[in-house]
Amino acid sequence: MSDKLLTIDLSHVYGFDKEIIFKKYQKKVDQIHQDFLAHKLADGHMTGWYDQPDQNHQFLLKTINQIDKKFKSLKVTDIVYVGIGGSFTGIKTVLDFLKPKQRTGLKIHFVPDLSAFQAASVIKEIKNKSWALITTSKSGRTLEPALNFRIFRNLLNKRYGNKHYQRVVVITDEKKGLLTKMASNHGYQKLVIDSNIGGRFSTLSPAGLLLAKLFGHDPKAILKGTLQAKKDLQTTSLENNSAYLYAVVRHWLYTTKKFKIEVCIAYHSLYEYLLLQHRQLFGESEGKNDKSLFPTFSIFTVDLHSMGQLYQEGEKVFFETVIDVKNPLVNINLPPSDFDNDDELDFLLDKSLNEISDVAIDSVIKAHYQANVSIIKLTLKEQSAFMFGYFYFWLSVATVMSGSLLGHNVFNQPGVEVYKKLMFEKLRSGH
């Protein structure tokens, strides 16, 4: 395994005995792994994301490059992106994770929900701008993106008339769905999400790769990261497969130690959507049959000044997973004071914000551990396109193992359909 890319530290997990845990779980992990590869898990055909790293991506990358060149030739300055669920969270995650290297001269506007204020704000911002519209939906029938796509497609048509098709990209199923029909009827550029890839596992489908390219990042590097992760995670050995080990420890903390909540923590606001992606992967895959951890998150050190008291001295119904990204793309050293050290910070002179943040991470872990909080620490080698691809694939693999240990179908989300059914019934009846 590439230990230098991602390491898992369990030294702050109370009661963890490697020998006992490995003996208890190894055979279960071996069986689930075999069933996963043999497509024997429930909805076991939904493994397109796992097959993706080994596939030939030349045609997709060529098409993405062509779209990028076309938008540049049209002098597009603004992208309106319409999507929800994994089709939104994943895109926001990759762009935020790599934001320090984002190209200038292009702005993205997300329209992910039913907020009239958000839609109106975007409409106001893109007025008189050269803009394009991208949407992701396999069926084309999910209400929130369908409504927003209508609103913004109409605006695009009013602005550009019979040439509006040049500025539309739909990312959808190869053969089925309303967006496929629209693309055929109006000449929209279409990228395909394979039918065996679910939304929360689709970040590195054409949607994520296209947006990464448009904003100056390297899709090839992202894909190389996924391929390396897949190579590293071929083994079922808990000694060498950190994704499976993470899944096992989560399961043990939930079933044996009786924790109900996992608080996933990062130390930079840029990683908020990375934590949201963690929440969706585990929450949507495991939240079934009244048997699951409740995944939530905090951004430190900001949340230490609101939730820190609870984490330190509140009831210990939770454990923490800390994601520490090393070698960030941006750093600042504390400069000498122009005001004769009246802020009394000269003892930190020439230290960087990242160095100080590292001290904060170590100090918080020590403080929380002393307060009987169990803490899993995941350390990522760097902030890069390659590392993002690696970690997203790693999380997806961990999700499958973790949910399968609970006996769940990790690829469906039947509970989401309940509100949709009720909502459509009310809307169609005039409520």
Swiss-Prot record:
SUPFAM superfamilies in UniProt: SIS domain (SSF53697)
Involved pathway(s): Carbohydrate biosynthesis; gluconeogenesis; Carbohydrate degradation; glycolysis; D-glyceraldehyde 3-phosphate and glycerone phosphate from D-glucose: step 2/4
Subcellular location: Cytoplasm
EC code: 5.3.1.9
Domain of life: Bacteria
Pfam family, one: PGI
Name the UniProt record assigns to this protein: Glucose-6-phosphate isomerase
Physiological role: Catalyzes the reversible isomerization of glucose-6-phosphate to fructose-6-phosphate.
GO cellular component: cytosol
One function term, GO molecular function aspect: monosaccharide binding
UniProt family annotation: Belongs to the GPI family.
Catalytic activity reported: alpha-D-glucose 6-phosphate = beta-D-fructose 6-phosphate
Organism name: Mycoplasma genitalium (strain ATCC 33530 / DSM 19775 / NCTC 10195 / G37)
Main location: cytoplasm
Keyword annotations of the record: Cytoplasm, Gluconeogenesis, Glycolysis, Isomerase
Enzyme class, first EC level, given as a word: isomerase
